[in-house]
Every structure is written in structure tokens, then in C-alpha cells.
């Protein structure tokens, strides 16, 4: 029954060239950026499915734009559900996704970005465990850029999404402040990173293509096979990014 499940919703955009990962253009082309978006989405969804084999999770894609249902139906693992789009802006999308999933009767809700394909599966499992413990709380996964890659809730708290400077380095800090204002305890997960600019793309490439001993890597993450395969192809075909993407097995 849904009240016994944690609804884990990926905040997902369909891979339409020119509308996704535009901060990576250049060095990527708009088409390459769209292909990277698809690879990341696929890996994040498979990661959620992996976590669902270890914890009481129902996977969702809170998708945008309207009319892209077929794209997600073809991409998502079996058992995933679609959450129709409400708003194009990040803050309102998060707010409405959380509200709608609680209204559907789920016992807890976790919203996760689609930009962290190597997020360790155990962080998703840990989130459900934290949300199953007695007492109200919010679970936050801080991102290296000052935002968060995940927010988990036991109850809907609209205040967590208000007065936030979205898409800035202040998001995580402001969300902590909003939680304090309403007396809501915060459980903090390990830091991870989003892939949305050249620096983080380089970090992703080092993690997936350089091996576990590469200096400066986030180690122990999800293998992200679709994203790794895309990066290997990219390294062979786009001369503008070859210096960013090491060959597999080299530091």
C-alpha cells in the first residue's frame, strides 16, 4: 500500500536539444548535451530501481515538458510512474511534486535531481531509513555547488520551498534556515555533486573513466554505465572536450 512506501521522484526534463544542460554548451554541442541528459536520466532511474530492491520505494519521474510522456515511458525502468508537470520553474516544480505525492497517500517523499548519475545507491536507501524513524524531519543531501541533490520529507512542509534563491550556491543554506524557522529537524547525508558545468563534467569523467584511484574523485558512487559509455564515445568524437575526458584506466 502506498502509505508504506517512500515515493522517490526524479526531477526530470525530456532531452530536447537546446533546452537541457545548456551550461555545457560549449564545449558540448546542444545535441551532445541532450544525449548526456538522457544518459544521466537513465542511470539515475536505474539507481532508484536498484534502491527499490533494498527499501520500500516507488519510483517516479516528475517530468517536464507536457507532451514528453513517450520519451520517459521508453526510458524508465519497469514499475516507474510518471508525475505530470505543473510548473517549469525548479522551486515550484519541487513544491508541487511533494504536495501531489503526499496527496496520493505516500508515507514519505524524496525528490532527487537528475544531474547526479553516480550518486551512491546507499544514500537513497539511507534516506528511506531516516524517514522511517520516529519523529518528523527533513533529509537533505548537500551538493558541492551549494544546492542539494536530494530532499526527503515525512510530511509536506511548504515553507521549505519558500524564499529560496533557486539555482544559486545559497539553496542548501537557505533550506536549512527554513527548516529551523518551523522547528523541523534536519538529517544531513554525505555531500555529492551535480553535473551541470565544465568543472563537474571533468569530475564525472575522472570518476567514471579514470578508475577508483584517481586524485580528487568522488569514490564509491553508482557505476552509471550509460553515462560512462556516453563519455567514452564523446572523448573519441569531440576534440573540444578530449582534454577533459581521460581514457579509461588512466589518471
Kindly give the residue locations of the regions a language model identified.
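Short beta-strand/loop segment that forms part of the nucleotide-sugar
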Residues: 57-65
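N-terminal nucleotide-binding beta1-loop-alpha1 segment
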Residues: 1-23
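Conserved donor-nucleotide/metal-binding helix-loop-beta segment in metal-dependent transferases, i.e.
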Residues: 119-145
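Short, glycine-/small-residue-rich phosphate/pyrophosphate-handling segment
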Residues: 158-176
